[in-house]
C-alpha cells in the first residue's frame, strides 16, 4: 500500500514541500534562513495574538495597557519582549537571507525574488506600524515624521497624509487603524510566503556553486530537516538570551516616556533595522528626493536580476565581485550607524557618501565588474 503522506491530497502537499523535496546536496547554512524566517513569523503571530488580547488601541490607554501587560498579565513581560526582540531577529534573518540571494545569484529565479521583495516591503510596513502601537514618545514622533513624508508627493500629498492620519495630526484614528493593519498584515505575509515557496519549488533551490544540481539531489528529510532544526535551536538560543538578559538593548529609552505631542525628542530615529534607509532619506536635502531615495533603497533589489551581466550565476568563483559585495555590506553597516547619529558634521557628509556608494555599487560597479570578470575567463 502506498504511504498515506503520498496519497492524501493535503499530506501530499506537505510531503512534496518538506519531506520528499529534491534538494541540492551542497547547500550551506546560508540556506537555513528561509526556515528561520518561517519560525520568526510563527513566533511573531502567536506572541502578537496574545498581546492583542490585552492591548487597547486608544491614545488614552495604549501606553498603560502595555505597562499592564508587563506588570499584571502572567508572563506578559516575556510575551512582550519576545515580540519586540522577535522583530529584530526577523530582520536579522531577512537581511542575511537577502544577502545570500545577492551573493549566490538566487535572484535569477525572478518570480521567487520578486515575491521576496514584496515580502520585504510588507514586513517593513508591519514593523513600522507595530512600533507606533506602544504610544511612547518615539512611537508618536516616528509615526508623525514618516507619515509626513507622503506630503512630498506632488498635488495629492497633503490630502493623502490627512487621509492616512484620519485627522489633522497623528491621533486616536491613526493608532486604531495602525493596530488594525498591524494585526492583518502578518497573515497576508504568511500567504505571500506560501506563494514565495510555491515559486521556489517550481524551479528547485539554487546552490553555492550556482551550477545546475539536477544530477545530484537528496531528499529534504532527514538531511535538511535536521540541519534546519539546528538553526532553529540557535535562533531560539539567541532570542531567549536577548529577551532574558537585555530585553531593551535594541529599543529606544524614549519609548518609555508616554507620547507627548507638545514635546519633541532631541533625536527622532526608527528601530535599528530601518536606520540604513533612514540615513539614505536624510542624506538628500530635498524632501521629495529623500522619499524617492528611501523607496528606491529597497526597490533597487527588484532591478538586480536585470543587471546581472556575468556568465556565472554565483559569486563563488568571482573574487572581484566578492570584494564589491563585502564593500556593500560594510556600506550598509556604515549607513545603519549614521542613521542613529545626529544630523551634524561629519555625519552628514559620511551619510551622503555612503548613500551614493550604495546605489553606485548595485547599479554601476557590480555589473561592470561582472563584465570585466567575463573577459578574464578568456585568458
UniProtKB/Swiss-Prot annotation:
GO cellular component, one term: mitochondrial inner membrane
GO BP terms in the entry: mitochondrial electron transport, ubiquinol to cytochrome c
Keywords per UniProt: Electron transport, Heme, Iron, Membrane, Metal-binding, Mitochondrion, Mitochondrion inner membrane, Respiratory chain, Transmembrane, Transmembrane helix, Transport, Ubiquinone
Manner of cofactor binding, per the entry note: Binds 2 heme b groups non-covalently.
Keyword Transcription carried by entry: no
Main location (coarse class): mitochondrion
Signal sequence range: none
One Pfam short name: Cytochrom_B_C
Disulfide linkage: none
Recorded topology in the membrane: Multi-pass membrane protein
Residues annotated as transmembrane: 33-53, 77-98, 113-133, 178-198, 226-246, 288-308, 320-340, 347-367
Positions contributing to heme b b566 binding: 97, 196
Subunit structure of this chain's protein: The cytochrome bc1 complex contains 11 subunits: 3 respiratory subunits (MT-CYB, CYC1 and UQCRFS1), 2 core proteins (UQCRC1 and UQCRC2) and 6 low-molecular weight proteins (UQCRH/QCR6, UQCRB/QCR7, UQCRQ/QCR8, UQCR10/QCR9, UQCR11/QCR10 and a cleavage product of UQCRFS1). This cytochrome bc1 complex then forms a dimer.
Additional record remark: Heme 1 (or BL or b562) is low-potential and absorbs at about 562 nm, and heme 2 (or BH or b566) is high-potential and absorbs at about 566 nm.
Task performed by this protein: Component of the ubiquinol-cytochrome c reductase complex (complex III or cytochrome b-c1 complex) that is part of the mitochondrial respiratory chain. The b-c1 complex mediates electron transfer from ubiquinol to cytochrome c. Contributes to the generation of a proton gradient across the mitochondrial membrane that is then used for ATP synthesis.
Name under which the protein is recorded: Cytochrome b
Species this protein is from: Sorex pribilofensis
